[in-house]
């Protein structure tokens, strides 16, 4: 995940690459493409699609949301992976054997996408489930932050054993709010001490193991006036300085409702690009991802 400084990640429309998309991804400011279910029919097709992409831009990286459970973009001809909640339940019932199994699931997920020439998955989810957020729910390992930390560490080890990078999400924790940031503006009224003693624990334990982190599109008004996506407090002071994270920071989809600021989508993009020279922030003009990386920073583990 090197050389992401000030560059962009885009999505594409279908199962083949259009001429317009070839022009977009050949731009030197584009570093990656994220694939969705709409881009996948079977393994042969997606390999061909990725070959088209990399023939157009050889150094481009390919990512996918292949978490397991209900968020698994590639399904046909792939092993159906268990949800993280199912793995967490196994961890609660049989901790010793679960660690090895969870590591194997992480390895399997990463190996399958690697064999299709995908470079990384936006996984694992590190949110602590408080039985509040339907958008998180069974995507979380557990309602116990320590169990989330242990299970996620094993999952990450499996990903790394397969030779791929990992992305922990959604910093500093999306599991305690009901609103879905895809269609709403989630807000959490808790204090910083409450967040540090609960939701932040998995991120604090795992920063040295994570190659990248994705912030949540949500606000903590009693902690900082800015949403996490745009917050110097959360991204610089807490994540970079306090937790010593040196890897890549991906934003979630900027077209989501939770990413809106006063103005419109273009204003959100301009907010990032105007800071890019100082902070290493790039924006996906197609509406998918923000990429932020500290100058000189490398992968976290």
Residue spans for each PLM region:
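Conserved small/polar residues in nucleotide/adenosyl-binding loops
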Residues: 272-280, 297-301
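Active-site-proximal loop/short-helix segments
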Residues: 74-81, 119-139, 143, 165, ...
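Second-shell residues forming the walls of enzyme active-site clefts
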Residues: 10-11, 17, 38-58, 62, ...
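Extreme N-terminal starter segment of soluble prokaryotic enzymes
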Residues: 3-7
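Generic short N-terminal amphipathic or hydrophobic helices
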Residues: 280, 289-290
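A generic, well-ordered mixed alpha/beta core segment in the N-terminal half of proteins
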Residues: 82-112
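Catalytic domains of carbohydrate-active enzymes, especially glycoside hydrolases
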Residues: 24-35, 117
